Amino acid sequence: MISASRAVAARLVGAAASRGPTAARHQDGWNGLSHEAFRIVSRRDYASEAIKGAVVGIDLGTTNSCVAVMEGKQAKVLENAEGARTTPSVVAFTADGERLVGMPAKRQAVTNPNNTFYATKRLIGRRYDDPEVQKDIKNVPFKIVRASNGDAWVEAHGKLYSPSQIGAFVLMKMKETAENYLGHTAKNAVITVPAYFNDSQRQATKDAGQISGLNVLRVINEPTAAALAYGLDKSEDKVIAVYDLGGGTFDISILEIQKGVFEVKSTNGDTFLGGEDFDQALLRHIVKEFKRETGVDLTKDNMALQRVREAAEKAKCELSSSVQTDINLPYLTMDSSGPKHLNMKLSRAQFEGIVTDLIRRTIAPCQKAMQDAEVSKSDIGEVILVGGMTRMPKVQQTVQDLFGRAPSKAVNPDEAVAIGAAIQGGVLAGDVTDVLLLDVTPLSLGIETLGGVFTKLINRNTTIPTKKSQVFSTAADGQTQVEIKVCQGEREMAGDNKLLGQFTLIGIPPAPRGVPQIEVTFDIDANGIVHVSAKDKGTGREQQIVIQSSGGLSKDDIENMVKNAEKYAEEDRRKKERVEAVNMAEGIIHDTETKMEEFKDQLPADECNKLKEEISKMRELLARKDSETGENIRQAASSLQQASLKLFEMAYKKMASEREGSGSSGTGEQKEDQKEEKQ
């Protein structure tokens, strides 16, 4: 157990009395920089970073993801291989072990619900025992399991995957989208996270980037990124609120924009509130109504539930622009009396009634954020809406009532976050020079002290990066080591907050309690990730302490997952190569058979039979295409093409000679006719 040194505390008080408040702040480990000085240091730091190549901005969303890059001074959102500007954050594993990402995964979810993962961002950095995870287990068709480290992982076909891995598969798709556009490898990235993510969730997101093969230069908050997208070309100084209600999380941030400086004043939110909850609420309503009308309970039928889930999401989206929608699902299920169909009309008012409590849950964080930023709603010059759920009229009305002004539609709610991430990438690369971002830590950071009390060292909404040191001592005579538990949260007792990890400082010289002086430094970097170091002031010996959390991914875990991801990438490349070769082969077969039929009178029968044998061999090869390489199929197809070209060349020559013969014969007859006329 540790305690604050009484002697040191007394000296600190004395120093404060004799030297004034500034000295006291230096004495207790405060860095002593004024706000303006901090800004100058930040600018110098940005300018000194040398980043080679393009930096992509990625919004790794709960429901959809988006990628953007800077083109000159403008950010450009990129289209994926399917031609869409956003990609569903869905990953599926088929029975034969194939991995699908994005829309192909979403399309097959109805027939493969148990092995199709969606909204796994809600699990990232979370323990299996978290109440939110336990709630999620009841709502999703796939298996959420306890990993060996106690984290929540998912299972498909007997294989376990961490949420960071699933996120990495989505990031690989975004990376591929960027590379297809850029024409070269995309290595560096800025990835966004919900502002209210804790240290474990931020670290797990960085891990996802590493697994996908990306160098994550910075993790930035989603509302802050959206503010960058909004304010990049604005010259007016103002305070703005960013209301971000996405697929899985809710954030509210209050920012001040002043001469290119984007300073976050406060942030708040709920990491388990979003569009998925709206879908789930509507799904429960539909299932309840269906049971009332037919007596059939759909909760035991995963395939039927997946169809209802997709219909609920579609209805939710339609009701943003229509006052009523129809939900029609024929042959949804069956009982002894025959097939059962779902036919239901749903009005906007009904839907709003179903989700009213969810919308209300966004109000308290907004009020708290304004209170922390010390602003009233009259001080806020603009309210920016981010996230797909903000298209819902009831949400927009709630925001208007809350802030006393109609929200701005200046940014695309689906793309603003990725655009902001790309802008921050431009800042880090030195391409954007007139922007400075000052973000904050969303949660207080501290340690557990005697009696299980949570002692805060860095308060929430402190501008990051930041550092704070404090002197601790032993709680017992002769104590040679101290255990320090690092927590994050706002509750009074340490046990009620998120335990980030704990470490033990050993090798303290035996002494009476309260005598050893151990200076512990807590450091939050620009990604919002926590680092801790300690120094024994008595011996002058300094030690770097690595927080050993009982959860999270180890270095070996990440290395294995990187190899796994590379294996999948190689498999994807081979599959693509094989598909392209098969398409080429089938095209050659079709063209060859068409030409053989067209020129059958000019082709020698024995040569035709040989070519037909070649085609049969090619078809046999295509029948076992899954076990063949793309190169083998391509070579066989090229061989068939060469053989067919030789044969058709023979046919062409024969036709040409026949035409020549018939032409000369016709000329002779014409001359005979002319002779007869003269006679």
From Swiss-Prot:
Which UniProt keywords are present, listed alphabetically? Answer: Acetylation, ATP-binding, Chaperone, Cytoplasm, Hydrolase, Methylation, Mitochondrion, Nucleotide-binding, Nucleus, Phosphoprotein, Transit peptide
Q: Where is this region: Nucleotide-binding domain (NBD)?
A: 63-431
- EC code(s) of this entry: 3.6.4.10
Please give the residue positions where the record annotates the modification N6-succinyllysine: K135, K138, K206, K300, K368, K394, K567, K600, K610, K646
Q: Which Pfam families match?
A: HSP70 (PF00012)
Q: What's its top-level EC category?
A: hydrolase
* Phosphothreonine, modified sites: T87
Family that this chain belongs to: Belongs to the heat shock protein 70 family.
Q: Which PANTHER family match?
A: HEAT SHOCK PROTEIN 70KDA
Its annotated function is as follows: Mitochondrial chaperone that plays a key role in mitochondrial protein import, folding, and assembly. Plays an essential role in the protein quality control system, the correct folding of proteins, the re-folding of misfolded proteins, and the targeting of proteins for subsequent degradation. These processes are achieved through cycles of ATP binding, ATP hydrolysis, and ADP release, mediated by co-chaperones. In mitochondria, it associates with the TIM (translocase of the inner membrane) protein complex to assist in the import and folding of mitochondrial proteins.
Q: Sorted alphabetically, which HAMAP family does this protein's record hold?
A: DnaK
- What this protein is called in its record is Stress-70 protein, mitochondrial
What is the organism lineage in this UniProt record? Eukaryota, Metazoa, Chordata, Craniata, Vertebrata
